[in-house]
């Protein structure tokens, strides 16, 4: 198992170590590798929709996050990945406990990756099934450690 980076507060971090929405939602990375990523977040008032149940967008966020972490680890050094499509089927609601995402690759290609993500509650019941397609950016064999595409150069006249 690969030990994922963390922020000073102990929350999850992006592969470059920066804090993100993952820290705000107390996402934990339980396992991270190019063949499988398992992430978990607590279900509480922060992630509820107005009816007191888990907001579907949070399921989508966790699904794409797990797929993105795995895809970044599966990509060649120097390449980065970005989500280009996410399909999520919400199967049942959750009021409290934890939501766990288990992401595995369906296809890891040179320019496209597809990941399947199963989200479950603390009892192992299916909450959401998702599929995420990611585009692999950058030239093969580029600088090691790139996670995000480079910022555009400033426009000069």
Label each residue range with its predicted role:
Residues 1-157:
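Terminal targeting signals and extreme-terminal segments of soluble enzymes
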